[in-house]
Amino acid sequence: MKDLRFGRLKCYSLHLGILPLTVLVLVFFCFVCLSLRSQEWGHPGAVNRKAYPQPRVLTPTRTDVLVLTPWLAPIIWEGTFDIDTLNEQFRLRNTTIGLTVFAVKKYVVFLKLFLETAEQHFMVGHKVIYYVFTDRPADVPQVPLGAGRRLVVLTVRNYTRWQDVSMHRMEVISHFSEQRFRHEVDYLVCADVDMKFRDHVGVEILSALFGTLHPGFYRSRRESFTYERRPQSQAYIPWDQGDFYYMGAFFGGSVVEVHHLTKACHQAMVEDQANGIEAVWHDESHLNKYLLYHKPTKVLSPEYMWDQQLLGWPSIMKKLRYVAVPKNHQAIRN
């Protein structure tokens, strides 16, 4: 009888131990299911039945520019996409886009125009989180935001040299991608603050990994690119290699791919620093090295990075979407 009672007691204790564990597993499973962004099972949502012109296989959308890379990544120009169709696809996925921008030291003066024009032209109709990194949080302007859009201010330290501010951007984005961004957004767009949005910049740019053609080199041969040419640097690219020259002021992709890019660039810069060398164009040099060997899945045309004051407005550019703001570089950087 004693053995029987002891056996029942053990069984009862076992049940008591299993029950909380089962509840914990079920709670965790439900949390994971709810947390999988853009991967919900069930009804795919309402589909837009709007009529649009049929794509014509024998009629290219643009014949004056390259629209496809050798690795089959599209190059995004005006006339190569249907934004209504793309908007519908990304809304069905309930996409949230993060836009990172660094407004450090005197560069905070550009933030108001940047945010105001972003509200007019950047990812209109989609959920957006602006991540503003600054050493002057009190100077961040109050800009009215549309529905589904919010601003997050994140405090960072400043550096004496503007080059160091630029290079440490990679470290900061890498850290926050892993610790925060991956829980809040689906895509990241990393932009310079001393710019303004002049025309539509939308979901046509979104992809696993995208880079933007430098407006000063999109017509040039690789021998003219200002890659880092010293073999001692981790950013080194030989003279006989290179696809395009990418601008460091506008890049992005999925959070995981941006994390990989920024982490690799930061680690390369740390190694260069240990060896007493600094790449010719700092983080941009390392960005170009990374995108040479980790091909972007989309390439943005210079419509998405232009300086009209320096380059005018050539006829090949049907739209100027993201443009430089006139400034005194020396006064701002010092």
UniProtKB/Swiss-Prot annotation:
Q: Please list the residues that bind Mn(2+).
A: D192, D194
Q: Report how it sits in the membrane.
A: Single-pass type II membrane protein
Query: What highest taxon heads this organism's lineage?
Result: Eukaryota
Question: What residue ranges are annotated as transmembrane?
Answer: 16-36
The entry marks the following residues as binding UDP-N-acetyl-alpha-D-galactosamine, namely: F102, A103, V104, Y107, D192, V193, D194
Q: Please provide an example of a Pfam family that matches this protein in its UniProt record.
A: Glyco_transf_6
Q: Which residues bind an alpha-L-fucosyl-(1->2)-beta-D-galactosyl derivative?
A: H214, T226, E284, D307
- What residues are glycosylation sites in this protein? N94
User: From the Swiss-Prot or TrEMBL record, what is one GO molecular function term?
Assistant: fucosylgalactoside 3-alpha-galactosyltransferase activity
- The primary location reported for this protein is Golgi
Q: Which residues lie on this side of the membrane: Lumenal?
A: 37-334
Give cofactor(s), names only: Mn(2+)
Name used for this protein in its record: Histo-blood group ABO system transferase 2
